[in-house]
Amino acid sequence: MTPAADGDDDETTCIRALELIFTFVVPMTLKATIKLGLLDALTGGGHALTADELAAAAQLPAEAASSVDRMLRLLASLDVVKCAPTDTGGEAAVRRYTPAPVCRWFAGERSLAPLAMFLLDDDYLSTWNQLPAAVAGGDGQVAFEKARGMPMFEYMGTNRRLNTLFNQAMVQQSTVVIGKLLERFQGFDGVSVLVDVGGGTGATLEMITSRYKNITGVNFDLPHVIAQAPSLPGVKHIAGNMFESVPNGDAIFLKSMLHLHNDEDCIKILKKCHQALTHNGKVIAVEILLPAIPEPVPTAQNPFRMDMIMLNNHWGGKERTEPEFAKLAVECGYTGVFQATYIFANYWALEFSK
């Protein structure tokens, strides 16, 4: 039985404080269940499973069942999984588990599990210990750089294992967001040549050009990235540096690019895009928008969490409000309509018209 606080403000705030302190338990438990294959086993089971059955399905020793049960009952209390106790006739009830709706985001083809595995990896997560020193230092070094001695993307080139986790996380997250973009955004209508700046190996453009057969895709990234890009129908790969020049097109696509940079660098990027656009061209940027007011609701909390990730990872990187993006558009010479279209999970499509 869970005791009630009975209107005791002191107890209510203390419980809230403890909740914040113990928050780390949730993602670390989630990571363990993903790594052990428990959530895959649960979502693939087709029926309610006991901890013993889940342990067996995940090929864990029988002795692990008790620990499995303890992890899953925590997740049940958070509505990640569902729990239904079964009466055993006077003995301790046996809990049977089924996946809750949110569980599908941690298993299967559209899983966000790779994102969790990257963010909770020791080589990444431990960099957050340097956040106080980075904030107090005032020397332009973010926590990640203080911890690893070099900027994040440079470090990724030295840690193949972590880089693989990062790439898997970005591919899965982009697949989800771009899939929703293609369902809900009409801004690609009428586009002939679409340039994806920072497009990686072309996976995003492949999704877009598969839907819009009339679009010729130009995938633009650094030479070492383009060197790994596969041949794709309807997509041309070009190597270069966006701070120097951008290939010509009537639309330029920027997916989660601007939040990596400070305002000065964003202006440089957007001006190079402006120069490369046709007369009536536009930039389509997919970004998270910060709410104007930090309200205590998930739709506001998640953008502010992402902003903290930028603060930890990249010097000058940050999430922005819609007015801040509109201001950047004006400063870069985009005199046409600026508009924001909501896509999915805090992501927006921003159109900067020339």
UniProtKB/Swiss-Prot annotation:
Q: Which Pfam families does the entry mention?
A: Dimerisation, Methyltransf_2
Q: Which family does it belong to?
A: Belongs to the class I-like SAM-binding methyltransferase superfamily. Cation-independent O-methyltransferase family. COMT subfamily.
Residues of the active site: H259, E287, E319
Induction or repression: Induced by UV-C.
Q: What is its EC number?
A: 2.1.1.-
Q: Per UniProt, which keywords does this protein have?
A: Methyltransferase, S-adenosyl-L-methionine, Transferase
CDD domains registered for this protein in UniProt = AdoMet_MTases
Entry-linked InterPro entries: COMT-like, O_MeTrfase_dom, Plant_O-MeTrfase_dimerisation, SAM-dependent_MTases_sf, WH-like_DNA-bd_sf, WH_DNA-bd_sf
Q: Does the keyword Ion transport apply?
A: no
User: Which GO molecular function annotations are given, in alphabetical order?
Assistant: O-methyltransferase activity; protein dimerization activity; S-adenosylmethionine-dependent methyltransferase activity
Q: Which GO biological process entries does UniProt record here?
A: biosynthetic process; methylation
What Gene3D superfamilies does this protein map onto?
Answer: Vaccinia Virus protein VP39, Winged helix-like DNA-binding domain superfamily/Winged helix DNA-binding domain
Give binding positions for S-adenosyl-L-homocysteine.
G198, D221, M242, K255
Name of the protein described by the UniProt record = Caffeate O-methyltransferase-like protein 2
Top-rank taxon of the source lineage equals: Eukaryota
